[in-house]
Design a protein with these regions (language model features):
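Internal catalytic domains of large membrane-associated glycosyltransferases
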Residues: 1-210
Length: 210
């Protein structure tokens, strides 16, 4: 029976609605707990928030969540004083500081939720196929409120699976990283995926944003 290597679940956040972010972390944690594989995963809330009110609320909410779930030592919170290079820099800082402990990381968005069973499946895929560097899921939009969001959510439900199948066909063994809802092999990502600044002025030069 294959047991997945240790996996980090990382939530990079930036001045978000604190209660909503931590509720998604809570739901994800509890869903993973139900799989019986929680011991193979550790959670990180990686804050780049610039408002002192926000990051103090984040710290208080993190401590409260850990007490509720008895998750000290399994859910970690880090606030970065200088949010250099935005989200990409946030993830890079995690990889340099803590990445050596983990074989894989699942990168979430602040508004992401993923079922625990899906996380376990992703980790097992990486374990079974050591040449895979990244597995990108196909996220679905839920809970949209605005007209544009509702239209986007409908189109996502109506033909999202067909779009993903077509994308997989044309990409073959390669793949695009959308920046979230993906599992990544940490060592390979750290060694080969650092991107340089482009020469010239923005928007065609400077930092690579996406």
């Amino acid at each position: 029976k294959i047991v997945p290597d240790l996996t980090a679940v990382v939530f990079p956040i930036y001045n978000e609605e604190v209660s909503e972010v931590f509720e998604r972390v809570r739901r994800t944690y509890l869903s993973l707990q139900k799989t019986g594989r929680l011991d193979r995963f550790e959670f990180f809330i990686l804050s780049d928030s610039t408002s002192s009110d926000v990051w103090l609320e984040e710290e208080e909410t993190w401590a409260r969540l850990c007490r509720e779930l008895d998750a000290f030592g399994r859910i970690f919170y880090r606030h970065r004083a200088l949010n250099t290079n935005s989200k990409a820099g946030n993830i890079a800082d995690f990889c340099r500081t803590w990445g050596g402990r983990y074989s894989y990381m699942i990168v979430m968005d602040a508004d992401s939720f993923m079922e625990g069973a899906t996380m376990v499946k992703l980790a097992l895929l990486m374990q079974k196929h050591p040449r895979i560097g990244i597995v990108q899921t196909a996220p679905k939009l839920i809970g949209a409120v605005s007209l544009f969001g509702r239209i986007q959510q409908f189109s996502n439900q109506a033909y999202g699976s067909l779009f993903t199948a077509g994308l997989n066909f044309w990409q073959g063994p390669e793949g695009n990283y959308w920046g979230h809802n993906a599992i990544i092999r940490v060592r390979s990502f750290t060694d080969y995926c650092g991107l340089p600044d482009l020469p010239g002025k923005e928007p065609f030069g400077g930092k690579i944003l996406s």
